[in-house]
From Swiss-Prot:
InterPro entries referenced in this protein's UniProt entry, alphabetically: EF-G-like_DII, IF2_II, IF2_N, P-loop_NTPase, Small_GTP-bd, T_Tr_GTP-bd_dom, TF_IF2_bacterial-like, TIF_IF2
PROSITE patterns: G_TR_2, IF2
Name of the featured protein: Translation initiation factor IF-2
Gene3D superfamilies, alphabetized: 1.10.10.2480, P-loop containing nucleotide triphosphate hydrolases, Translation factors, Translation initiation factor IF- 2, domain 3
Chief subcellular location: cytoplasm
GO molecular function: GTP binding; GTPase activity; translation initiation factor activity
Pfam families given in the database record: EF-G_D2, GTP_EFTU, IF-2, IF2_N
Positions of region (G5): 339-341
Sites where the protein binds GTP: 203-210, 249-253, 303-306
Length: 695
């Protein structure tokens, strides 16, 4: 038997759906939830016959009379019934419905309408696979009893039900055995060949790291860097006496500890730059600790020996205090006195690096699949995802398929550190490659695989695992944060999204900002990425109440428009210190304010009603000021405060009221309090916040 929706019948009767719902309930005892509910055609015809001859105004009046006849007690009882009805479970599927689902699945398979998903999928991704609008998929989920937003995760079984509604069959994606695919046999000693050392230059800010690299590379970089410090990690290869050395250029300021530490992990030798006129400084000690932790040998370059205040012996004494005893003092730490500005003893320094590397016996097998690390990555408008890779073993060639973290690609083009196109790169050689599907993370490992299909499947598998781990981690963090807030008092949190032009800057800024956290305000970077600020970033910021910081990047037009609509704050910077100052200002705004109490109004209880499952309703007369729903309330009896809580409901006749002013009557209930009596005074108040002006 066919059915008709309430809104369609209301249209035929020329009345509002709301009025028809009331008439159905009061006059025909037909319960419907909303305008999308359906009723049998037979009932609809009967209703039309019975209401024939009545004008729309009569029908509306009839509905109003039915509604207005309710007492305040009826209103509360109706609301309770509605809440109970919401808890009624949906009936199980009939055999006929199950057979229909099986038929749809068979048809889908015959027509080739099959999609493949993993253990879970977001609503947005499912809509894209189904080639359906997201709103339609959300509506289908709601009808299936699942409330899910566009970015919400749904399990395989729920996705399967949704797809059945669209006549599409779902298959579970096979798990890829990653260890089997990436398994590489141990290299035979006879296949190993000498490889160039990978060197990182470290030291305190302004001690001459970039100047030393300039001198080595014969290229000026210092003058063009924003803020006077190196901002991005690069890699360069130089030749000395027929032998190659690869340099990683890591930032020298202590704010970029994360990038410098990552550089040490793939480094064979570290050149520690110490200014002869300045000695050991905090960042110098930090660099020494990183090298010791990574087990990387150090060659010390005592720089600026041409300056009048240079004191080499004092530097060596301070190095000895840090556990680095110079060779000429009886130790095993190589110290070379240099001047980057005067190009003095630079070749000697490089010879010491090669000597240290020779003692390490650095070897690799170039005749195998390439493996290595991402040094830097960025999104280029014209070229797409661009990654700087350091090959650590094997040989990487144009046309190879590679798996990089949770992204993949087939190398379309490869460039050396001078920008020259090359076809292959062996161990310890840095290259810039094009052809990746997305921008990888700096520090990700890359592996060459047999074909692009394998790389794509493994990347998608890693993404699924990462997504599941992130959801679980977020849940754990939420519980931990709740515990910590209870333990430490009310801790405020400033959520930040960081976007930058290169991945190294993202990590550096993240570390700098999180260092600003205090006992009162925690700074948390909830997301960091490379490239322009997008709509996805703004959506995340809206959901997380976060601000967006862009470092050398800008929002695209759509993102800027969405940020204006949603009131999301976007800040753009070129110098990291400006970002730190602005975040400090934002933190002051997050501090717990001081409070003072403001009395809103008082009312006298003149009558009480008791309703089972609801509690005691107080009929009141407002004496002065106003009563405000959800405001703090205290009950006063004979001049003594007997209870404090919030107003759980406030009504004026049958209608919910936000507030009721002096001289009017109202009905109210108080949260967790039923012992209210006639003659009691209800006092409504609020705590007004007074902002603090400093951390």
């Amino acid at each position: 038997m066919s059915k008709i929706r309430v809104h369609e019948l209301a249209k035929e009767l020329n009345i509002e759906s709301k009025e028809l719902i009331t008439i159905l309930k009061e006059e025909f005892n037909i319960e419907v939830k909303n305008h999308m509910s359906t009723i049998e055609d037979e009932d609809a015809e009967l209703i039309k016959e019975l209401l024939a001859g009545k004008s729309p105004s009569d029908l509306v009046a009839s509905a109003d009379n039915a509604e207005n006849s309710k007492s305040i007690v009826d209103v509360y009882e109706d609301e309770l019934a509605e809440q109970l009805n919401k808890g009624i479970k949906k009936k199980k599927k009939t055999k006929k419905e199950e057979q229909e689902e099986a038929r749809i699945a068979a048809e889908a398979e015959a027509e080739g309408k099959v999609i493949e998903i993993g253990g879970s999928i977001t609503v947005k991704e499912l809509a894209e696979k189904l080639q359906q609008p997201s709103n339609d998929v959300i509506r289908t989920l709601i009808f299936a009893g699942v409330m899910a937003a566009i970015n919400a995760e749904i399990d395989f079984e729920t996705a399967e039900k949704v797809c059945a509604e669209y006549g599409v069959l779902v298959e579970r994606k096979e798990e890829i055995q990653e260890l089997e695919v990436l398994k590489i046999e141990e290299d035979d000693e006879e296949n190993l060949q000498k490889r160039p050392p990978i060197v990182t230059v470290m030291g305190h800010v302004d001690h001459g790291k970039t100047s030393l690299l300039d001198c080595i590379r014969k290229a000026k970089v210092t003058d063009t860097e924003a803020g006077g410090i190196t901002q991005h990690i690069g890699a360069y290869t130089i030749k000395l006496n027929g032998e190659e050395i690869t340099f990683l250029d890591t930032p020298g300021h202590e704010a970029f500890t994360a990038m410098r530490a990552r550089g040490a992990q793939i480094t064979d030798v570290v050149i520690l730059v110490v200014a002869a006129d300045d000695g050991i400084m905090p960042q110098t000690k930090e660099a020494i600790n990183h090298c010791k932790a990574a087990g990387v040998p150090i060659v010390v370059a005592i720089n600026k020996i041409d300056k009048p205040g240079a004191n080499v012996d004092r530097v060596k004494q301070e190095l000895a205090e840090q556990g680095l005893l110079a060779e000429d003092w009886g130790g095993d730490t190589i110290c070379e006195e240099v001047s980057a500005k005067q190009n003095l003893n630079i070749d000697k320094l490089l010879e010491m690096v090669l000597l240290t590397a020779e003692m390490l016996e650095l070897k690799a097998n170039k005749d195998r699949r390439a493996v290595g690390t991402v040094i830097e990555a960025k999104l280029d408008k014209g070229r797409g995802a661009v990654a700087s890779l350091l090959v650590q073993n094997g040989t990487l060639r144009v046309g190879d398929s590679i798996l990089v973290g949770s992204t993949y690609g087939r190398i379309r083009a490869m460039f050396d550190d001078t920008g020259k196109k090359i076809k292959s790169a062996g161990p310890s050689i840095p290259v810039e490659v094009l052809g990746l599907s997305e921008v990888p993370e700096a520090g990700d490992r890359f592996n060459q695989v047999k074909d692009e299909k394998t790389a794509r499947n493994m990347a998608e598998s890693r993404k699924d695992k990462l997504k599941a781990e992130t959801l679980l981690a977020n849940h754990r963090v939420s519980l931990e944060d709740l515990y910590n807030q209870i333990k430490e008092g009310k801790v405020k949190e400033l959520a930040i999204i960081v976007k930058a032009d290169v991945q190294g800057s993202v990590e550096a800024i993240k570390q700098s900002l999180e260092k600003l956290s205090t006992d009162d305000v925690k700074v948390r970077v909830i997301h960091g990425g490379v490239g322009a600020i997008t709509e996805t970033d703004i959506t995340l910021a809206t959901a997380s109440n976060a601000i967006v910081i862009g470092f050398n990047v800008r929002p695209d037009n759509n993102a800027a428009a969405q940020a204006d609509r949603d009131g999301v704050d976007i800040k753009s910077y070129r110098i990291i210190y400006d970002a730190i100052d602005d975040v400090k200002s934002a933190m002051i705004g997050m501090l717990e304010p001081d409070y003072k109490e403001v009395i809103l109004g008082t009312a006298e209880v003149r009558e009480t009603y008791k309703i089972s499952n609801v509690g005691t309703i107080a009929g009141c007369y407002v004496l002065k000021g106003k009563l405000q729903r959800n405001a703090e309330t205290r009950v006063i009896r004979d001049g003594i405060v007997i209870f404090e809580s919030a107003l759980s409901s406030l009504k004026r006749f049958k209608d919910d009221a936000k507030e009721v002013n002096a001289g009017y009557e109202c009905g109210l209930t108080i949260e967790k309090f039923n012992d209210i009596k006639e003659g009691d005074i209800v006092e409504c108040f609020m705590m007004e916040a007074i902002k603090r002006k400093e951390l």
